[in-house]
Curated annotation (Swiss-Prot):
Classification lineage: Bacteria, Pseudomonadati, Pseudomonadota, Betaproteobacteria, Burkholderiales
Substrates-to-products reaction catalysed: UDP-N-acetyl-alpha-D-muramate + L-alanine + ATP = UDP-N-acetyl-alpha-D-muramoyl-L-alanine + ADP + phosphate + H(+)
Residues annotated to bind ATP: G112, T113, H114, G115, K116, T117, T118
InterPro entries registered for this protein in UniProt: Mur-like_cat_sf, Mur_ligase_C, Mur_ligase_C_dom_sf, Mur_ligase_cen, Mur_ligase_N, MurCDEF_pg_biosynth, UDP-N-AcMur_Ala_ligase_MurC
Record Pfam families: Mur_ligase, Mur_ligase_C, Mur_ligase_M
EC number(s) stated in the UniProt entry for this protein: 6.3.2.8
Organism for this UniProt entry: Burkholderia mallei (strain ATCC 23344)
Descriptive protein name: UDP-N-acetylmuramate--L-alanine ligase
Alphabetic keyword roster: ATP-binding, Cell cycle, Cell division, Cell shape, Cell wall biogenesis/degradation, Cytoplasm, Ligase, Nucleotide-binding, Peptidoglycan synthesis
Subcellular locations according to the entry: Cytoplasm
HAMAP family: MurC
Top-tier EC class: ligase
Gene: murC
Length: 465
């Protein structure tokens, strides 16, 4: 690619999916430029590495580019896209550029509706501990690396495979993981769940004859497609027929302790530095891959025990001063689908037994709120206190029957929790100040702008201290 394409431009370079690819390309020696609507820590990091970042979208930004990379979030009337068309500069979907990176190494692609980012991070961490020095591209900031991407010198590249826009079908890895299959982003599949499952089957057909599909057999929908997968399958989970299985699982001090059973191997005791049964499953995927690649058991154990997490995935911000005295424990999480939210809430209950759980939640997308409305009511009703914001639109038109007010009214009617509704995320800190008490566990949750709230709360506590 490099003898023809030397300068690559990213429209929306600050996004989680785009920035990682951009960073790897910078480190490979390409000239990288990009644009976004605002500066953030990611764009500043890319600039420090040598990328040229413009704030705002303008046709002039693509000057000299041999290719323009876009995600599905970029509109067709974006001025940089229009300029690329006019100048006949190739417009490359993000997933196609990721596929090009995978051609340079042996790809390990992590797919599934939930758990992709954490699983990708665990796989990368375990392979790194085993001396394989992988390249990785992750949808969140891996704490130990201080970034969401890294160019390694080893043979493997570990990356998330996105089913939300069916772009994972552009990838041709040698190992695939399927964590679960759930109803989300159903507009991509014509609101036909059978089409979604078929897409995952087609994903496995991208594997070479020597490849393998590593699948969570605990998930009912994954179990249904296993007989239809024509390539070698490795099953992981808690189920009796899992080839990589967790037993004797116990939550202690915010960690998960368990024993791994693998066919033909000695039992492996593991301490995972993450809470929650769902994270045990994510770790099993990493263990299955590491075992296949002959990573030493001691390296697996060390990587999982020392895993420092991923940004916005059960990210702990420490103790925050409560308005009435004392302090509460603050956690931030990216969860935005009821299944993810339930897993995070269960993990918090397990990590902090007996403590009052306060949730500040910003729904993400009106269509998701509409499609999962009853499930949102059910999962939000399981917390002890709730701050609820208006829906983060993500470019969608409002739906009056699926907005924050409608969700609040449904929660009150259910009668299990009394939501405190605020119109904007800016009002969340004040609402939490009135609600959170000494000893509480407070979780800020959502895929939108609520991600900026915990940093503000932590900063306010430091200033007061």
């Amino acid at each position: 690619m490099k003898h023809i394409v030397k300068h690559i431009h990213f429209v929306g370079i600050g996004g989680a999916g785009m920035s990682g690819i951009a960073e790897v390309l910078v480190n490979l020696g390409y000239q990288v430029s990009g644009s976004d609507l605002a500066r953030n820590a990611v764009t500043e990091r890319l600039e420090a590495l040598g990328a040229r970042v413009s704030i705002g979208h303008d046709a002039a930004n693509i000057e000299g580019a041999n290719a323009v990379v876009v995600s599905t979030a970029v509109r067709s009337d974006n001025p940089e896209v229009l300029a690329a068309r006019r100048l006949r500069v190739p417009i490359v979907p993000r997933a196609v550029m990721l596929a090009e990176l995978m051609r340079l190494k042996q790809g390990i692609a992590i797919a599934g509706t939930h758990g992709k980012t954490t699983t990708t991070s665990l796989v990368a961490s375990v392979l790194a501990a085993g001396g394989l020095d992988p390249t990785f591209v992750i949808g969140g900031r891996l704490t130990s690396a201080g970034a969401n991407a890294r160019l390694g010198m080893g043979d493997f590249i570990v990356a998330e495979a996105d089913e939300s826009d069916a772009s994972f079908l552009n990838l041709y890895p040698v190992i695939e993981v399927i964590t679960n299959i759930d109803a989300d982003h159903m507009d991509t599949y014509g609101h036909d769940f059978a089409r979604l499952k078929q897409a995952f089957i087609e994903f496995t057909q991208r594997l070479p004859f020597y490849g393998s599909a590593v699948v969570c057999i605990d998930d009912a929908n994954v179990r249904q497609i296993v007989p239809l997968i024509s390539k070698p399958v490795v099953r992981y989970g808690f189920a009796a027929d899992a080839q990589v299985r967790a037993e004797n699982v116990e939550a202690r001090d915010g960690r998960m302790h368990f024993t791994v059973r693998r066919e033909g191997r000695e039992p492996l005791p593991v301490v995972l530095n993450l809470p929650g049964l769902h994270n045990v499953q994510n770790a099993l995927a990493a263990i299955a891959i590491a075992t296949d690649l002959d990573v030493a058991d001691a390296a697996i154990q060390q990587a999982l025990a020392e895993f420092n997490g991923v940004g916005r995935r059960f990210q702990r911000y420490g103790e925050i001063a409560a308005a009435g005295g004392g302090a509460y424990t603050l956690i931030d999480d990216y969860g935005h689908h009821p299944v993810e939210m339930a897993a995070t809430i269960a993990a918090a209950r397990g990590a902090f037994p007996g403590r009052r759980l306060v949730l500040a939640f910003q729904p993400h997308r009106y269509t998701r709120t509409r499609d999962c409305f009853d499930d949102f009511v059910n999962v939000l009703s399981t917390v002890d206190a709730l701050v609820l914001t208006e829906v983060y639109a993500a470019g969608e038109a409002p739906i009056s029957t699926a907005n924050g007010d409608a969700l609040s009214r449904a929660l009150r009617a259910a009668g299990k929790v009394e939501p405190v509704f605020v119109a904007t995320v800016d009002e969340v800190p004040d609402a939490l100040a009135k609600l959170a008490r000494d000893g509480d566990v407070v979780i800020t949750m959502g895929a939108g702008s609520i991600g900026g709230v915990p940093g503000k709360l932590a900063q306010d506590t430091q200033q007061k201290g």
